[in-house]
């Protein structure tokens, strides 16, 4: 082989070696990249969109559920919470808030989500007790000594009284208060005209309409506006824990059963891949541990065991339901709280 041929052969050999080395490098790098970009087992997170006065409850429920899930599955998860007026929360979910679960204080705010296709129309059949793992009722909180001598619903319509109630258009708390006052007249043998007059007199006495129950509590306790606050039973107990004997709780002769329904927001949960965790989260509310925490936060549990255990925390109350008087939440909503309904006609006269 002459010198020129030898040089050409040497160049070809070295080029082939470089190509092989480069290919091997790419292969190794590719394996490294595949390893580097292998999907990690990220912690699943769910958001619970709830109503205004359940902050403290779910601050205890959430870590208890996370620990229970970890123990059963070995998986790490997180649960976040969002709070506001019940109807505001429903609207937020409709507008894009990615809550895998909702825990509301009235069925109508979940029905609205079903009407928008975010969850099934039969959502109330997905969990026990019409998907309501706990309930409460509406009571009064007065200043120390109850100086205005408030005892029952009719007292809230007396001239000169200042009553703090959240807005029934945005808050389930406000709707329950409105309906309880209305129904107190009907259940006592009164007419619709008399019920309307009481509610009209009551709202003449409302100096400010907060958007949710917690805002109303702040107005009454910290801004010191009003003679009486109408709110959920659990909220007044929390106020008494924080402020001691500065306030008194008054139970009216009759009040309303305020159920707290829950649901998996299927469209969101399926999009995020959180349905399994979301469903387990709501089932946890019915467990012994969940019902125990519910009762400790002065919400009335469904479990007979928990109800008996915490019986001293809950005064017997003569309760009626929205179904009893109105035939259901949809009918009550349409008649009283839809635009142009009874509340609008009453409040515009104020």
Predicted regions and their residues:
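Bacterial N-terminal signal peptides that target proteins for export
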Residues: 4-25, 35-36
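Sec-exported extracytoplasmic/periplasmic mature domains
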Residues: 62-71, 94-98, 107, 114-118, ...
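Ligand-binding pocket segment of bilobal, Venus flytrap-like solute-binding proteins
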Residues: 188-254
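Extracellular/periplasmic juxtamembrane helices and adjacent flexible linkers that interface
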Residues: 269-350
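Short beta-strand->loop
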Residues: 49-51, 142-144, 162-188, 202-206, ...
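N-terminal segment of the mature folded domain
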Residues: 42-170, 311, 318, 347-349
